């Protein structure tokens, strides 16, 4: 049985601005573990929701005792699939992420919901949930505990990264509207798709064998 963790936080920025910051947060000083990001799918539904799928490459070193479970010829980078759905009418954004390699060693699934803070409409509430599991016989509990601690550490980094991008945006011109941001993100997605590597395409194809969360 895996481990579960949940947290509730607040970003001191309006929901529209947090939505814009979400697509602009890499790189930032707190995201050095994020190596690449590629949008591999995007569409607007009939009810005007924005659906996206991104492929991210991250580097997160395992503890020394777990290194022996990696074959010498296997890359230690972790490939992450992120599905997201943006509902501008209800002002919510939900993301679901999971790793598509090294899942036997440790599988981490995360769900985040961004919505207007009910106590302060100028802030955004973020609810995060994570499920950590491992199939390694004899050490699965230790791996899961490590994964849970790593998740909590990454939540702190993610929050600081968001705050950094929000501060930069708030110090510049007024934030762009949701429609403008979505349009620019779509154009960027088209450019990224044209330049996507064969490796990214292959990994995205493998990810599609798992039941899609949103798209």
From Swiss-Prot:
Involved in the modulation of the mitochondrial apoptotic pathway by ensuring the accumulation of cardiolipin (CL) in mitochondrial membranes. The TRIAP1:PRELID1 complex probably functions as a PA transporter across the mitochondrion intermembrane space to provide PA for CL synthesis in the inner membrane. May be involved in hematopoiesis during avian development. Keywords: Apoptosis, Lipid transport, Mitochondrion, Transit peptide, Transport. It is found in: Mitochondrion; Mitochondrion intermembrane space. Pfam families: PRELI. Forms a complex with TRIAP1 in the mitochondrion intermembrane space. GO terms for cellular component: mitochondrial intermembrane space; mitochondrion. One of its GO terms (molecular function) is phosphatidic acid transfer activity. Signal peptide: none annotated. This is PRELI domain-containing protein 1, mitochondrial. Residues 36-174 form the PRELI/MSF1 domain. It catalyses: a 1,2-diacyl-sn-glycero-3-phosphate(in) = a 1,2-diacyl-sn-glycero-3-phosphate(out). GO terms for biological process: apoptotic process; phospholipid transport. Expressed within the blood islands and in the liver. InterPro entries: PRELI/MSF1_dom, Slowmo/Ups.
